[in-house]
């Protein structure tokens, strides 16, 4: 089957689209990436998403309209990846669209029950591409008592499980998440959870203090030093004290968190602040490894993916943080995969599993009561 996976993440970089060929299903799936591209959001759409993400500034009219606008954006992104690959849209079998997360509440808060909302109307995508769309992957897991995240572990087992090595797959996107993939010889369970912020705080600080969208290659963070009192404040965040399975997002590490941090520590240089929040991402990862993974698993390799794997300052900090753990650290490209394409490929794989009516959540990662088939299916017009 030829499937396009569509992902728009918490970092709002743009729309990641991967054209993938998949043979079979389940752990025996054969997955080939044909082409990957990122289609940037225009400034108007990006600002509308940012407004929709803000509890203070959002409104139902905005979200209703944006749902259809993003559906059209996602459809155009599907057309673009096919065009770049010289692949006829008529040959496409399926689209797996994650959507744009507007709000994610994994745990009950007062009378607000666990819930999640991703937008990007699948009917618009199906109509514009004349292709069946599978979307809304998180909701069935949450209906089954899970947190709706992380969902990528299922695809990571298919792509990265090794005959003899125990691997950690560390994604550093807007949020960071880790998947523990025991070797094929092991009887230990796959586990996965969010470790905290990835690029989200770093990017927000860059935008506010340097008027830059992100810290390219970690060049600015390389110039500063870590401020202990800022790092201690960050590491005291309640999320780090929670036991897995757990997930987080912009609600905990977005604009509100950064506003409070910058107000509290405004006396410090902007370079030092950026260096310190970069170290916060690293320390939150290392903290979770040492508390929840390394006491129970012997890890041979850590494989980094996501935009953060291109931040050489962050990667070097992580190498230093794990230097005593006797594990090799790679980025996806070192073993023949694309860091950028990882999540888009994952949703192509999840769409394939739904098409075959196979469960594809990992209850040990999400906390769901059982394995479930994920996603809603939207057929194109006849």
From Swiss-Prot:
One of its GO terms (molecular function) is kinase activity. GO terms for biological process: 1,6-anhydro-N-acetyl-beta-muramic acid catabolic process; amino sugar metabolic process; peptidoglycan turnover. The keyword Nucleotidyltransferase does not apply. InterPro entries: Anhydro_N_Ac-Mur_kinase, ATPase_NBD. Its EC number is 2.7.1.170. It catalyses: 1,6-anhydro-N-acetyl-beta-muramate + ATP + H2O = N-acetyl-D-muramate 6-phosphate + ADP + H(+). Keywords: ATP-binding, Carbohydrate metabolism, Kinase, Nucleotide-binding, Transferase. The keyword DNA-binding does not apply. ATP binds at residues 9-16. Pathway: Amino-sugar metabolism; 1,6-anhydro-N-acetylmuramate degradation; Cell wall biogenesis; peptidoglycan recycling. NCBIfam families: PRK09585.2-1, PRK09585.3-2. HAMAP family: AnhMurNAc_kinase. Belongs to the anhydro-N-acetylmuramic acid kinase family. Catalyzes the specific phosphorylation of 1,6-anhydro-N-acetylmuramic acid (anhMurNAc) with the simultaneous cleavage of the 1,6-anhydro ring, generating MurNAc-6-P. Is required for the utilization of anhMurNAc either imported from the medium or derived from its own cell wall murein, and thus plays a role in cell wall recycling. This is Anhydro-N-acetylmuramic acid kinase. It comes from Bacillus thuringiensis subsp. konkukian (strain 97-27). The gene is anmK.
């Amino acid at each position: 089957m030829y499937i396009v996976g569509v992902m728009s993440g918490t970092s709002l970089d743009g729309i990641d689209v991967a054209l993938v060929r998949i043979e079979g299903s389940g752990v025996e799936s054969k997955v080939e990436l044909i082409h990957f591209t990122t289609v940037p959001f225009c400034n108007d759409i990006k600002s509308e998403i940012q407004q929709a993400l803000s509890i203070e500034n959002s409104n139902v009219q905005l979200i209703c309209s944006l749902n259809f606008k993003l559906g059209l954006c996602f459809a155009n992104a599907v057309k673009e990846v096919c065009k770049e690959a010289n692949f006829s849209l008529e040959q496409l079998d399926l689209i797996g669209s994650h959507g744009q997360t507007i709000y994610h509440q994994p745990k009950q808060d007062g009378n607000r029950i666990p819930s999640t909302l991703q937008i990007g109307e699948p009917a618009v995508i199906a109509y514009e591409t004349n292709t069946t769309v599978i979307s809304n992957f998180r909701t069935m897991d949450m209906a089954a008592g899970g947190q709706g995240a992380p969902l990528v572990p299922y695809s990571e087992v298919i792509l990265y499980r090794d005959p003899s090595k125990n691997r950690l797959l560390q994604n550093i996107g807007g949020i960071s998440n880790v998947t523990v993939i025991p070797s094929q010889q092991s009887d230990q369970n796959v586990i996965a959870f969010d470790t905290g912020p990835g690029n989200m705080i770093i990017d927000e600080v860059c935008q506010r203090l340097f008027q830059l969208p992100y810290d390219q290659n970690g060049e600015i963070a390389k110039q500063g030093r870590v401020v202990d009192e800022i790092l201690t404040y960050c590491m005291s965040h309640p999320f780090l004290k929670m036991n897995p399975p757990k997930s987080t997002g912009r609600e905990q590490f977005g604009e509100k968190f950064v506003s409070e941090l910058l107000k509290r520590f405004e006396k410090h240089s902007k370079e030092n602040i950026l260096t310190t929040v970069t170290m916060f991402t690293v320390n939150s990862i290392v903290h979770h490894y040492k508390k929840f993974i390394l006491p129970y698993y012997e890890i041979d390799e850590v494989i980094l993916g996501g935009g953060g794997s291109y931040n050489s300052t962050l990667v070097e900090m992580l190498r230093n943080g794990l230097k005593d753990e006797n594990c090799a650290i790679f980025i996806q490209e070192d073993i023949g995969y694309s860091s950028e394409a990882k999540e888009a490929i994952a949703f192509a794989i999840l769409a394939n599993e739904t098409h075959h009516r196979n469960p594809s959540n990992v209850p040990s990662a999400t906390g769901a009561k059982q394995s479930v088939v994920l996603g809603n299916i939207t057929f194109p017009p006849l």
